[in-house]
Amino acid sequence: MVQIFKFLLKSSKSTGRAHFRPTFLDTLRLAVRGGHGGNGLPKYGGVGGQGGCVYLVAKEGLTLRKVVQGLKDKRVAASSGEDSSKASIFGRRGADQRIEVPVGVQVYDDQQKLIADLDEHEATCIVAGGGTGGCTATNFLGRPGENRTVNLDLKLIADVGLVGFPNAGKSTLLKAVSNAKPKIAAYPFTTIRPQIGTIEYRDLRSITVADLPGLIEGAHANFGMGHKFLKHIERTRLLVFMVDIFGFQLSPKHPHRDCLANVYALNKELELYDPSLLEKPSVLLLNKMDKEGAHEIFTKVKPLVSDLASGLEQCPEELRPKQVLNFDSIVPISAMNSSKITQVKSQLRRTLVRLAEKQFLADEDQVKEKLRQRVGVVGPKIT
């Protein structure tokens, strides 16, 4: 009996560890070195081959986890250039090393200076240049290649980002609207790593949705790994705030905040982390409308969340933002029984289409302005 108990205890521990093991990787540190330049040949004035370079190339469908699995270790070196010889006065260039990384990776050096932002498919950057081949300027000695450490920081690229406190129902919504299968349970912090799902429409249009782990108050100051999660909404085009209509309490040690206070709290967290996020189009979903008393609360709170500025005086000072969100729409839903899910999908699409049209017109105006500047006052008028 004791042996059985020990076996069950061991099994439960291993399962717990497996659940919290970080399978999602969004940062990676690599040591990169360009190839050494080949030596020249003084007798004949020969020039050594240049050392190879280390490139990063953005590819869709990749993850940093796959990048790590494809490397023997986290050190990458390009080949050295060939020495000059009688048979080959100009030494051959060393072979380059190309590392494929996910789209959305930002590359930083050890001083946290941005080297490149690989936000498009096939975007490329050199992270370690090759050494110069030996020539008269170097006394015919090949120069060493660039040797340094780079940090890769992945920021997910999705159309929609789900934002909310723990246990608000974000994962349930993601499962209802998309093909994703996130873990769902009736306790906070079910989602411990970002999840991405795709909403597919009948006309083959698709929208990607990122479900981020629940935030806590103080996320802007990196409490609860807030920075690790908040950074992923920087590249999203539309923010969807998910709030429990009955409010939320993280633990018995924390105060219970009602629905309106939670909206202000989320507003404040984003403002303190990056005020520009408040300029993004946003939608508010008030969840758990299937429960008794939800409609009465919604009737009272809808006018207030429709105009957050009007209720700032009643908002607790620690939650009061300087700039308030202006929601494009407010939808009461029940993610559990899929109530109004079709309306949510339609609303997300309409908002993104409107945003794309606005961007198209802005780009068109920029093109016209550039043409006006090139043509000048003598050319034909462009309307």
UniProtKB/Swiss-Prot annotation:
The Obg domain extends over: 22-157
Q: Where does GTP bind?
A: 164-171, 211-215, 287-290
What the entry lists under Pfam families is as follows: GTP1_OBG, MMR_HSR1
Keyword list, A-Z = GTP-binding, Nucleotide-binding, Nucleus, Ribosome biogenesis
Where does the protein end up? Nucleus, Nucleolus
Q: Respond yes or no to whether keyword GTP-binding is given for this record.
A: yes
Q: List GO terms (cellular component aspect).
A: mitochondrion; nucleolus
One GO BP on record is: ribosome biogenesis
Q: Which GO terms describe its molecular function?
A: GTP binding; GTPase activity; magnesium ion binding
Q: Where is the OBG-type G domain?
A: 158-353
- Disulfide bond positions: none
Q: Which family does it belong to?
A: Belongs to the TRAFAC class OBG-HflX-like GTPase superfamily. OBG GTPase family.
Functional note: May be involved in the ribosome maturation process.
Protein name as annotated = GTP-binding protein 10 homolog
Species of provenance = Drosophila melanogaster
